[in-house]
Amino acid sequence: MLIGEIKEPVSVLKGTGKVVLAQLERLNISTIGDILSYWPRLWEDRTQEQMFSQWTLAHRLQVRVSVTAHCWFGFGKSKTLKLVVQDGQGCVAELLCFRRNFLHFMFPVGSEAVVYGSFYEKDGLLESSSFDIEKIDCIEKKILPVYPLTKGLKQMKLRMLICAAMDQWIGTVDSELPKPILEKYHLLTKRDVLLSMHTPRTLDDVAKGKHSLIFEEFFSLQMTIGMRSLQKRGRLPLTQGESDQQSAIPSVVSELSLLQKKLHRCLPFELTVDQKRVITEITQDLEREEPMARLIQGDVGSGKTLVAFFSCLKIIEQGGQVALLAPTELLARQHADTAARLLAPIGIRLAFLTGNVKSEGRAYLLEALVAGEINLVVGTHALFSKSVRYHDLRLVIIDEQHRFGVLQRSALIQKGREGNPQGKTPHIIMMSATPIPRTLALSVFGDLDISIIKSMPGGRKPVITYIARKTKAEKVYEFVGNEIEKGRQAYFIYPRIHDIGLTDLKSVQCMYMYLKNYFARYAVAMIHSKMTEEEQQRIMKYFSEGTVHILVATSVVEVGVDVPNANCIVIEHAERFGLSALHQLRGRVGRGDVQSYCFLMHGDEMTECAKRRLKIMGSTADGFVIAEEDLKLRGPGDVGDTKNFEQSGYSGFRVADPVRDYPILQVAREAAFELLRKEKGSSEAR
């Protein structure tokens, strides 16, 4: 049977009283299957002996010693034993025996022992309070697993319980992976995995066991992803190789529909190679019977929205409706304004719907939607509220998709089914201005076809990034003033809205007053999330028109703000912002044909992680490189849509790491999809 099918309670093991059962419950261990698959977090190599001279802070030592003295420190009940020991080279160390004074009797002066532990240096001597000590004749040289614990539970007890479970049940365990997969990819059976993880003979055993477990976790997820895609679309997602082949499509102009050609002729610039390719990929998807599910990734300012509008026209020309969902009213308004500028002149009927649309206008808009008089509606979460109904919603475009939960996205998709005459699932395009690392793209977003826009519109110059201490603020302000004198505009970004007075963190409101006085000749405005949507829209309108020269803001301007004349952004307390946020904020400039500048101002004290973030920002402007580095710094659980994906079946990895184990992920994906293709072919043959 499979390990997860072993449902006997862990209480059948000897030595599991009420206290131990409660401890195991805190570790989510309630069955034999649970305890067998409770994997170690590391393994201690106790097969080799070292000398104290080989000590480093990063490693534990196993040393054969002789006890040379017993010392005591503290008074009364807190009196504690200190064992003084010496290795074969005469190097001395001290063992602080907190709550282990009984070692005084077990290891008298002159006795020999083997000590295993981590040491630190104090006053020229090595000391340890975290150690194991065994008599010479009792020592077993082996690889010991070390498990995550909970309060009161000891390693020795947990090891004993796991070994007892292994002795009784290991013979009943079958492998989750099919035998041909095990053989083709040289993987261990599940029984051998259990032996390699819990009772390894060598560290090589551990490596083989971990590799097989990692492959199994990735394979299981990719099978789920593949089956979901087959159910929804009748085909598997594109593999990396197939995506690369698609990227060879050189041109799109000849394949444009009538409305798309009209929009293309109106553009004052040429589409980039990547935009053309992605438009073709989407157009081909829209001509298929099964619903499209595609993620468009692009760096800041790469032109994803324009690609989405070209996609809209294909659907509208076929008589369908399109809904474009944005996470904030500010971003939704930006999209609506862009659509009005580009699509209204070629006859597209547009609407804008948010929670703030007044009742009279809202009633008319809802009637027009259900009557099919509106081709494209742009809005926020109001698009999937109960009162909104569609005539024939065939395409849903979700911008900044990571800001929406799976349930919210599903609600809008359900609206499409309800509003479709045949009850079909609408096509889905998700857009992300935060590049998603390839590692997460294959794991978390593996059931989507992925299009990548890397090439940037022509004529743009790379943003020059400066990293400076806060003491250089005056020079930075002076530089920005010179740029504004030339007719440019600037952003000043701060981590707080209000000055709370407990720290030296600058705030938007405080710096707005300061900068208004410093740049007295120019118009200075502020914007933050506590302002009403109407206030934010008014300020952004003034800034876009050039009436406001300097915008003091929080990260509310992180996405969706496109002002080509703004060429300076000053981010103060940059060490307080995440890598992704810094990259998005930097993307507010560099959108015109003039040289742009980003100033990352930091305080005197920074964590190592903050220093690393700023160093990365100074070394590259490639959003995909930054996304990979961000994933390394924060881990896969904190990046992208991982938590949202959990709602639809993703439960995370226990051993695998998509960053560290990316090569295994690629192989497991190919293996899973190959198996699904064979199964699909067999079922069709029948």
Curated annotation (Swiss-Prot):
NCBIfam families: PRK10917.1-3, recG. GO terms for biological process: DNA recombination; DNA repair. CDD domains: DEXHc_RecG, RecG_wedge_OBF, SF2_C_RecG. Residues 285-453 form the Helicase ATP-binding domain. Monomer. Plays a critical role in recombination and DNA repair. Helps process Holliday junction intermediates to mature products by catalyzing branch migration. Has replication fork regression activity, unwinds stalled or blocked replication forks to make a HJ that can be resolved. Has a DNA unwinding activity characteristic of a DNA helicase with 3'-5' polarity. This is ATP-dependent DNA helicase RecG. InterPro entries: ATP-dep_DNA_helicase_RecG, DEAD/DEAH_box_helicase_dom, Helicase_ATP-bd, Helicase_C-like, NA-bd_OB-fold, P-loop_NTPase, RecG/Mfd, RecG_dom3_C. It catalyses: Couples ATP hydrolysis with the unwinding of duplex DNA by translocating in the 3'-5' direction; ATP + H2O = ADP + phosphate + H(+). Residues 472-632 form the Helicase C-terminal domain. A motif (DEAH box) lies at residues 399-402. Residues 47-141 are annotated as: Wedge domain. Its EC number is 5.6.2.4. GO terms for molecular function: ATP binding; ATP hydrolysis activity; DNA binding; DNA helicase activity. Keywords: ATP-binding, DNA damage, DNA recombination, DNA repair, DNA-binding, Helicase, Hydrolase, Isomerase, Nucleotide-binding. ATP binds at G298, D299, V300, G301, S302, G303, K304, T305. Belongs to the helicase family. RecG subfamily. The wedge domain within the N-terminus inserts into the replication fork junction, where the lagging and leading strand split.
